[in-house]
Structure formats: C-alpha cells, structure tokens
Amino acid sequence: MTDLTASSLRALKLMDLTTLNDDDTNEKVIALCHQAKTPVGNTAAVCIYPRFIPIARKTLNAQGTPDVRIATVTNFPHGNDDIEIALAETRAAIAYGADEVDVVFPYRALIAGNEQVGFDLVKACKDACAAANVLLKVIIETGELKEEALIRKASEISIKAGADFIKTSTGKVPVNATPESARIMMEVIRDMGVSKTVGFKPAGGVRTAEDAQQFLAIADDLFGADWADSRHYRFGASSLLASLLKTLGHGDGKSASAY
C-alpha cells in the first residue's frame, strides 16, 4: 500500500461528508447519505442543514449505516454575536436529532476586540450539547481572522469554553482551510495539553487525496500517527470523497460538489 493510498483510506473514514448549499433538497441529502457508504468503508459523518436531519437519519438507518454520525451547523455561516439565537438554533438542532453541532464562533466580535462574547456563546452551546451527549465543533473562520494571534486566540477561547473540536472554516468565505492555519490550531491543542479531549477539523478547500495527506501529516507530526482518529480529526469536505475513492481504485475522481 502506497503512502497516498494509506492516507486516503484514513482520510475517507475521517470525512464529514458535507452539503451546505442554499438549493439543498431531500433528494440531495439522500444522495449524500448513499455516498457516505463506500466500497472501502463509511465516512465518519454527514454534515447537513438541521431541517434535513430526519431524512438523513432515515436514509442512513435504511442502508445499514446507523454508525455514520449526523452533524449540522448553527450560527452559520455569519458567526454573529447573538448568543440567544445561536443557543436557540443549537437546541433546535439537538431536537432534530443531531449527533454533532458545528457552531460558528463570533469571529468579527473577536476582531473588534471582544473576547468575552465568543466564550459565552460557545459555553452556552456546549452546555446544551453536553446535556444531550452531542459533540460540539467550533468554527473559528481562520480565513477571516487572518492573523496568527487571532487564530490562536479564537482557538484558545473555544477550547476553554468547552469545544470538543475546533474547525477552521465555514467553506463560505474566500479563504478556507490552509496548512498554515491547521498547524496553528493544532499547536494550540498541543500547547494547552488537551489533545486527549479536543479534536481538529479542517473544512473547505481540502479537495484532493494529496491535500488530505498534507493535512494528516501535520497532525502526525504534532501528535504521532495514532492521534488522528474520528474522535480527534475530521475533514469537512464533499469533493474530496471522489478523489480519495479514485486513489483507492474506485470511481473516476469526479464530483458534483466544490466544498
């Protein structure tokens, strides 16, 4: 098995296979759930808008893949600083049956100098998730924060407020996951001594088997080869799946999606 083949198989099983488009339909979500079941194993999760959680659950159960988790998004993609709205959306997502919630950190407030609202928003959502045994991922929007100090600060605040994962991006801004931002965020996990309990998710812009290999190599470098399991590492992507499957000898590498 080549290094790229091995990393592709790892990456596939760490994917949050994603569709977060304005024109999403039940049919598109059903198709996504079908794609999550591949000839070489299942993706870790599907990531969809909250209203599609019931149809996703039904589809995943019907095809014999109930272990594929259902992730959804809240405070998305804008990352506003209204805690009550973010919390209400998170509670609604839990009520729909989400296994995991990816909430957008109020990154513009942090850029403006307000650290407290980010902590309070994440903590409120974490408390709701913890009560329901739901995993919380916090999207810090690295491509908008831009500066290393802000990326580091948003990561630290999110972790202190209870994030189970820190995630780079919504996939809805010009710059999404980059190797540079990934390393900064994972260094925070290392430096805070929380690698047992906090994971990392690059999202948006991870499109090829080679991209995935590069991102996994950073995790392996910082934490060793055994750390990046589905509790500690996810890829938020859709078009990546076709590239991984092609590398693994299945399909032509073409995808209908650009996420």
Swiss-Prot record:
It comes from the Bacteria. It is found in: Cytoplasm. InterPro entries: Aldolase_TIM (IPR013785), DeoC (IPR011343), DeoC/FbaB/LacD_aldolase (IPR002915), DeoC_typeII (IPR023649). Pfam families: DeoC. Pathway: Carbohydrate degradation; 2-deoxy-D-ribose 1-phosphate degradation; D-glyceraldehyde 3-phosphate and acetaldehyde from 2-deoxy-alpha-D-ribose 1-phosphate: step 2/2. GO terms for biological process: 2-deoxyribose 1-phosphate catabolic process; carbohydrate catabolic process; deoxyribonucleotide catabolic process. One of its GO terms (molecular function) is deoxyribose-phosphate aldolase activity. CDD domains: DeoC. Gene3D superfamilies: Aldolase class I. Keywords: Cytoplasm, Lyase, Schiff base. Its main location: cytoplasm. It catalyses: 2-deoxy-D-ribose 5-phosphate = D-glyceraldehyde 3-phosphate + acetaldehyde. SUPFAM superfamilies: Aldolase. Catalyzes a reversible aldol reaction between acetaldehyde and D-glyceraldehyde 3-phosphate to generate 2-deoxy-D-ribose 5-phosphate. This is Deoxyribose-phosphate aldolase. It comes from Enterobacter sp. (strain 638). The lineage of its organism: Bacteria, Pseudomonadati, Pseudomonadota, Gammaproteobacteria, Enterobacterales. The gene is deoC.
